[in-house]
């Protein structure tokens, strides 16, 4: 089984439609306190609009969610009526691009996970991400996640599912995870994730395993404690980079590996290390610490969490 874990917002004005996909729940914690990551696309009837194919995919995903909705039929119908009205509105547009050209960069697409619907097949966010990347070689993999899966064997399920990615011999693996408060005088820093996952990460990347710990309160940045809740995967290659940001944790349910939540992410593709408005994909992760503040795997205590990940059905 799975849960509805996607966070998708569609805002409609007279001449503009905005799609927001992110990691934050529609709560005060999500929008005011946590460290979250959002991506927004604007659609309007001019040639510089984001291509309408992404919006249509998002509306189709919302319609799919309605299939499993347990709300009253009238509420469900209002959602379907709204997506239909948005489709009708943009159908009248004549200048907005319909899709990206084959070699156009940067480009973006919607990547979702969901269980098997009445007609069609289940969708895996990780499988789609890998299909977008292959057969390119990976020179760097960055994972930002507050949760990982609970392991039942010698391999981490998600890492094992990425085994077909061709890795450069010196590929770096960057793990951006929350830091738990340590007892006073402690010499090692605490990560509230299973020790087994840390072992699997080190096994995968060896001496090139990197860890960035994001504390709840960063000096000169935060006025109050803030939990890391953002989720992203950055794949870097020799000539191309892919950045996926949205609701998918680095867990089997989040990535759609054997078990499927309803998840939504945007995947951006660009030339390697390309700057847009002064920012690379690394910068857009928005981490509040320096990339130079990495921590040795040997200086970390991995602390098994007492509860299952938030995206696991209860």
What are these regions (language model features)?
Residues 1-314:
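PLD/PLD-like phosphodiesterase catalytic module centered on the HKD motif
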């Amino acid at each position: 089984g799975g849960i509805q874990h996607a966070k998708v917002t569609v805002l409609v004005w007279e001449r503009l439609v905005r799609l927001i996909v992110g990691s934050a729940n529609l709560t005060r914690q999500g929008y005011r306190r946590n460290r979250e990551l959002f991506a927004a696309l604007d659609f309007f009837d001019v040639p510089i609009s984001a291509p309408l194919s992404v919006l249509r995919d998002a509306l189709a995903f919302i319609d799919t969610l309605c299939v499993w909705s347990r709300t009253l039929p009238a509420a469900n119908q209002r959602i379907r009526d709204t997506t239909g009205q948005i489709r009708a509105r943009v159908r009248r547009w004549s200048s907005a691009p319909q899709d990206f050209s084959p070699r156009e960069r940067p480009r973006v697409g919607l990547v979702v996970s969901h269980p098997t619907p009445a007609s069609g097949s289940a969708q895996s966010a990780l499988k789609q991400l890998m299909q977008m990347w292959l057969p390119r070689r990976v020179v760097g993999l960055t994972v930002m996640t507050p949760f990982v899966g609970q392991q039942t064997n010698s391999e981490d399920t998600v890492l094992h599912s990425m085994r077909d990615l061709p890795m450069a011999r010196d590929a770096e693996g960057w793990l951006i995870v929350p830091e738990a408060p340590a007892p006073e005088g402690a010499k090692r820093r605490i990560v509230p994730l299973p020790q087994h996952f840390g072992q699997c990460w080190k096994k995968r990347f060896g001496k090139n395993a990197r860890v960035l710990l994001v504390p709840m309160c960063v000096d000169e940045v935060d006025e109050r404690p803030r939990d890391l809740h953002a989720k992203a995967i950055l794949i870097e290659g020799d000539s191309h980079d892919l950045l996926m940001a949205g609701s998918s944790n680095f867990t089997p349910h989040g990535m759609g590996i054997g078990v499927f939540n309803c998840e939504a992410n945007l995947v951006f593709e660009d030339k390697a290390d390309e700057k847009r408005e002064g920012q690379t994909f690394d910068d857009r992760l928005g981490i509040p610490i320096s990339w130079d503040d990495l921590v040795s795997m040997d200086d970390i205590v991995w602390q098994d969490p007492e509860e299952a990940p938030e995206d696991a059905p209860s």
